[in-house]
Amino acid sequence: MSYRLFSISVKLPVLSASLLLCSASLLNAQEKPPTNDASTAAPAPWEQIRQVPMSGGLRVFWNVAGGDNTTNYREAAAHGFEMVDLLNTYSDYPGRQKENIRKTLDTNKNNPWKKPEFFERIIRRNIEQRGNQNAIFVHDIEFSFEEDIDKAWSDPTVRAASKATSREQFGDAYLREWATWFTLPCQWAKERFPGTPVGIYGPQPFRRDYYGISGKSAQQIDGTHQSDAELWKHIDPFVDYYVASIYVFYDKPDSVYYMAANVEENIERTRRYGDKPLYAYEWLRYHSSNQKLADQEVAPWLAEAMAVIPYFCGARGVALWGSEPKRQGQYYQTLPVFTKSLGRVSDLSAKLAAAKLMPDEPAHVLWKARRPLVRRMRVSADEWIILAVNPWQNEDAVSHVEVSLEKSRISVELRGRHSEIFHCRGENVTRL
């Protein structure tokens, strides 16, 4: 693939209010907001939603905007969700997009030294107007650029702009300069709001992948994602946390392993830099690029899975994103399922936060072999918390999987496609 594409857009306008209202016109064409379905029963009210307070350093974020922000922001916060300052960093809403930075990249895919003259002014203004009201600050910066360095090197204008004297020197300078399109906004946000954690929705240490993981070897996966790592090494010093986008595309067993693998692969590639937390961005609707399922809410078994899997794969939190501009009240039929599942993590969050994630077979290996996903968190020699799910079996099926602990080996029962969590203390095993 010639161009780097960060395909999920979560575009929101720059407003001085503490929270943003996401409009349909601001979304990527592949992520159109859902239309109202009058035939669908109203979702459960917030009064029937389980609270999910976190402790010990684990977190859950609410990044859903819609037609009833006042109610949903208030209720989400009361239920344990933290809020997000999400900024469409390159936008120019006051100027009706006349100085939209992203638009300049439509005709500039290979010259990172060609920033528009309004680059800094627009970004600093947007940061100021976005404000600093919430738990974390997220720059939404997504664009494609030429990944073929030889092709970029062959352009005399770009080569001259780089001032590089060799192909090798150019390669490093080229990616380093593209990185500044992401890192400068982070620097400016930190200058304006010292102490606020700043990160990026866009490039990742491991670019979100599905078919590049499914059925592939570790060597094949590394090869496909080499350019991610080369770009990220220039970005890493400027972010306080990582984002892994795991929006679901398919109502298939594979989606469980896709979520797990994308979190794990990002975690694996970031530990060389330290232990900054990773947050998994999720959506309670299928990604709109799947036209068959576009705008439908994910199946309940997937809502149950996405609520807990990231925490057992190294993530320190999940961020629930969404855009519901035409809806009032609580937006989702599946939110009760999501929070009920997440509540199991909430109840044990202090223990899980301090537990050690034990080595297990990579998710991509289990995916290829169609075996259950099992993850083990060691609290102590006598206390473990286990996640196990077999999405390949029917909803009414039951199977068993053996799990090795430090002092014993246990067999746990897996019901249908449920994401099961077991709390093991001594000889006692409790299904949560």
Predicted regions and their residues:
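Bacterial N-terminal signal peptides
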Residues: P13-A24
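Glycan-processing catalytic domains of CAZymes
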Residues: Q30-N428, L432
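Sec/Tat signal peptide C-region and signal peptidase I cleavage site
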Residues: L26-N28
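Bacterial N-terminal signal peptides that target proteins for export
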Residues: S2-L15
